[in-house]
From Swiss-Prot:
GO CC, one annotated term: mitochondrion
Pathway participation: Protein modification; protein lipoylation via endogenous pathway; protein N(6)-(lipoyl)lysine from octanoyl-[acyl-carrier-protein]: step 2/2
Organism whose genome encodes this protein: Culex quinquefasciatus (Southern house mosquito)
Coiled coil (UniProt feature): none
Cofactor: [4Fe-4S] cluster
SMART domains: Elp3
Cofactor note: Binds 2 [4Fe-4S] clusters per subunit. One cluster is coordinated with 3 cysteines and an exchangeable S-adenosyl-L-methionine.
Name of the molecule in the record: Lipoyl synthase, mitochondrial
Note: This protein may be expected to contain an N-terminal transit peptide but none has been predicted.
Keyword Iron-sulfur: yes
Keywords for the protein's UniProt record, in alphabetical order: 4Fe-4S, Iron, Iron-sulfur, Metal-binding, Mitochondrion, S-adenosyl-L-methionine, Transferase
GO molecular function: 4 iron, 4 sulfur cluster binding; lipoate synthase activity; metal ion binding
Binding site for [4Fe-4S] cluster 1: C104, C109, C115, S350
HAMAP family listed in its UniProt record: Lipoyl_synth (MF_00206)
Amino acid sequence: MKYFFSLPFPKVHTTCKHTAAATASQPLQKIRERLESGPGFQEFVQNPSYNREDWSAYEGKLKREKGEQDRLRLPPWLKTKIPMGKNFSRIKDQLRELKLATVCEEAKCPNIGECWGGGEHGTQTATIMLMGDTCTRGCRFCSVKTARAPPPLDPDEPKKTASAIASWGLDYIVLTSVDRDDLPDGGSNHIAETIREIKRQNPRIFVECLAPDFRGNLDCIRTVATSGLDVYAHNIETVESLTPFVRDRRAEYRQSLKCLASVKEINPNMVTKTSIMLGLGETDEQVEQTMKDLRAVGVDCLTLGQYMQPTKRHLKVIEYVTPEKFKHWETRGNELGFLYTASGPLVRSSYKAGEFFITSILKNRAAAAAEEATATKPSE
């Protein structure tokens, strides 16, 4: 005998295809509405949810422990606006047309939007990088291209640079350069010629130059220091113990100190300037000693800023230093006797915020020199 079992049929829910489509589109529509009413990309970059005067509430991780491989997340105080605007585009187009390199782009400076766009000071500027965009050294923090034999110098660069600067109508300009160890004079004559041409086209402008160490060659340093330059800058970059690890092996801590000391020997009235990066693993005691070493060789102006890893192949950030700690170093710099100390996460050696203070120093010195010359002039 055959037995037949009756099995229950599964329940099937049916809906009209138009109803199903409408139901599926509801969550999508809600997402679209949230995107339209929510913050834009610019707001994510600027991260306005934090009070930029007080970062004490920030709870993110700021320091990598020994052995950790993961990169730290960028804290909110280091997030900047996306560069844009008419001024930014105009200055970029002009530099391209003249085939001039800038440290702003090559070093991926976070302040490019403010400097090229005008920022709070209203005057746009760029830091011209002389002698091309390729360096003979390979510092582990720097994103500038490197090669043993870079292209030859452009003989028209001094005039093109001076013309661009003259068109900007500035009263202060910062020049920098790559290292050119492949040249007998390290490029010192090329730099000096550029400074002279800038002064020829605009005698009233103040010129600051962030110069190489020229392997400690005193003649090269003298060539630049006696070119009509107003501010001679050379960066110490980091503390002594980290120098072999951070900088190219040809760049030595004591050699940099000697360069800065030599400038003062050549011209005691020359304003000298240098910069220190923080966040590479240095201790407070090492930073303090570096500042004392710099004062011992007569350095006038000091800037301290946060090291930021430009690409994955460069040194990782060990620590993101807080704005409060940077403020401490600014106070300490003033106590040690620097004429000017700029210290902050986004401060860079060529950042224009310090130009106004240095300009006043130079103008006051010029006025004092003129007054002294008048006082000592024999009466007829």
